[in-house]
């Protein structure tokens, strides 16, 4: 299960011995788990949605999936409140949890583990930058198409089953605006709308 980690067998064996494998079902809010604040959490399998909380809303930032093993809880620092960033499981997920003190001790001994930590932080940072640029420069239709393409890639299917309300909440647009945007994409032959799903044509 840990073989995809970009780490040597020695380091992986240490993480196995001292870490804990945790399983979460779809819909679980990771901030509700004390281990999320007390240890470093590495995504092993599944899909997690990262959102930012603003005015009682949760706006989608980006997704994490197991194609790239990564530290999830980059907000696990004294200066960053977990109330700001929300991590929601959208496909059953497996996480490796390592106590904070032990992980920091290991990073001082194993450069590869420190590099993995830095790479994870950079990944989160660049995704936030990219999201900011998207919001600033793209039309609603462009945001919608990018969103649908991301879902298609994550679920490995051109047919995506997702409620209109969820799209509305993720992108922070009204359901009416999302519906109009989807209609425009359909008119431009980018998608086909069905009763309970969306089929991506432009992939």
Predicted regions mapped to residue ranges:
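Cyclic-nucleotide recognition modules
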Residues: 11, 61-119
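Short, small/polar residue-rich loop motifs at catalytic or cofactor-binding pockets
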Residues: 16-17, 35-37
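Polybasic "coupling" helices that flank or enter modular domains
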Residues: 108, 112-172
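Glycine- and acidic-residue-biased ligand/ion/polar-headgroup-sensing regions
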Residues: 38-51, 66-68
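Cyclic nucleotide-binding regulatory module and flanking cytosolic helices
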Residues: 1-26, 65-79
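Short phosphate-coordinating micro-motif centered on Lys-Gly-acidic
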Residues: 29-35
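Phosphate-/nucleic-acid-contacting segments
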Residues: 149-203
